[in-house]
Amino acid sequence: MRLPVLVVSVLAAALSLGACDQAGTSSTAMDGSLAAADGGIVSAAPRTVDPGSAHDNLNAVLWVQTSAEYRALSLQSFRAAADHLARALEEPNWDALVPSERANAGTGLQPAVIMDIDETVLDNSPYQARLVRSGEHYDEVSWAGWVAEKKAAALPGVVDFARAASIKGVTIIYISNRAQHLDEATIANLKAVGMPVKDADVFLGLGTHVEGCEQHGSEKNCRRQRIGRDYRVLMQFGDQLGDFVQVLSNTAEGRAALLEEYGDWFGERWWMLPNPTYGSWEPAAFNNDWGLPPEARRQAKRAALDVAP
């Protein structure tokens, strides 16, 4: 299947770094939750190491914070999405929800765009940078403290896109794996960077109850279904595959199959932002077993590398 050039460039840029998540944490740590192998939510314990030793996330965080390439990819994504917005509004059957997540017809509903927050709207790389410098790793206490600071900046291009969509009558919906109790600080941060926030109901954090749908772990499918009851979803933005569709099998093969099935949606209805610092792509390399020692996980990731023998 031919993928849009934009998609290929974003995926290539993110994956080529080869930088993994903070050792000893989950791939979804920055969303405020940890996905266990069985799909449940577990807590991360802080782990202190020698600050002078190599940190798994150093190159990835440095790239996000300093490279022109990262900024260019972000600008490119949001500008390209803006170019598709008029067409999405004009076509009454345009829908960015997969069929299994829409129980009702979207035609005639008010338009909306669904956005993940962390590393899609807000840049949390300063929090990551602190962990790299200190030699520590994600934990819920330090993460909640960072959220409370409300210092996350907006990704390049996102505010311009969101404001343009809002002017056209499109509601911006935020589906995030930040815990629901972090809503006030999160909404304040969104408003501070200039993002449109219609009301408190547009933030659907982890733990949001959706009647008639049982949420598994940190999956977002139930919350997407809830939005689909009231809105015609024109586009979705995220930095993880699970921001767009439910990932039932978090293996390299399972993830590749989803991309094969929905590849044509990227660059049109779905817009992926680069995030080399963490993601569910990492535990897919070691069978989602966060109980393995850090070095065992690194060995599994090395074994997954393609060296073109």
Question: Which residues does each PLM region occupy?
Answer:
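Substrate-recognition element of Asp-dependent hydrolases with the DxDx(T/V) motif
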Residues: 119, 158-190, 202-205, 239-241
